[in-house]
A protein has these predicted regions:
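A structure-centric signal for secondary-structure junctions around beta-strands
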Residues: 36-38, 59, 102
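A short, N-terminal "cap"/entry segment at the start of jelly-roll beta-barrel domains
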Residues: 1-46, 50-53, 121-125
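Short beta-strand His + acidic residue motifs that chelate non-heme Fe in jelly-roll/DSBH
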Residues: 51-52, 72-73, 90, 95-101, ...
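Short, conserved beta-strand element in jelly-roll/cupin
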Residues: 55-72
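Double-stranded beta-helix
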Residues: 3-4, 98-125
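Short histidine-centered beta-strand/loop micro-motifs
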Residues: 30-33, 50-57, 74, 80-81, ...
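Short acidic-glycine-tyrosine-enriched beta hairpin
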Residues: 76-94
Length: 125
């Protein structure tokens, strides 16, 4: 990375970091380290659900559907992303999600701050 360029493949790189491609959790000095924004390539099998609700949320997020059918759940409503390119933006809202079909999403969150990771499920890396 001496030329300040990193080229990768989201499907290949994402599994090493639970889907995350960029954020505070990448090693300092890595071009993918950022305290400003986080980017995720999320691949979710049908029926996959966030293990627990995000509470005390202080960040904003943009979720874009690449393929599948993906539901973002909020305290008083849900938004279903059903067509490629459908998206939702939210800020400081508690939420969860559910993959109604096998889905691929791109998630962007800002700022990138520690403390929101869900504990790993048994057998998860």
């Amino acid at each position: 990375m001496a030329d300040n360029i990193y080229a990768g493949s989201a499907p290949a790189d994402a599994p090493a970091n639970r889907g995350w491609l960029l954020g505070h959790f990448m090693p300092a000095g890595d071009l993918r380290h950022s305290e400003e924004v986080e980017i995720k390539w999320g691949v979710h099998p049908r029926g996959d659900r966030r293990a627990q609700w995000v509470t005390g949320e202080s960040r904003a997020a943009l979720i874009i559907l690449v393929s599948g059918r993906f539901r973002i759940e909020f305290p008083h409503r849900s938004v279903v992303l059903a067509n490629p390119g459908d998206y939702v933006v939210f800020e400081r809202v508690e939420h969860s999600w559910y993959a109604e079909e096998e889905s691929v999403i791109v998630g962007v969150r800002w700022p990138s701050i520690p403390g929101y990771a869900v504990p790993l499920r048994p057998g998860e890396k």
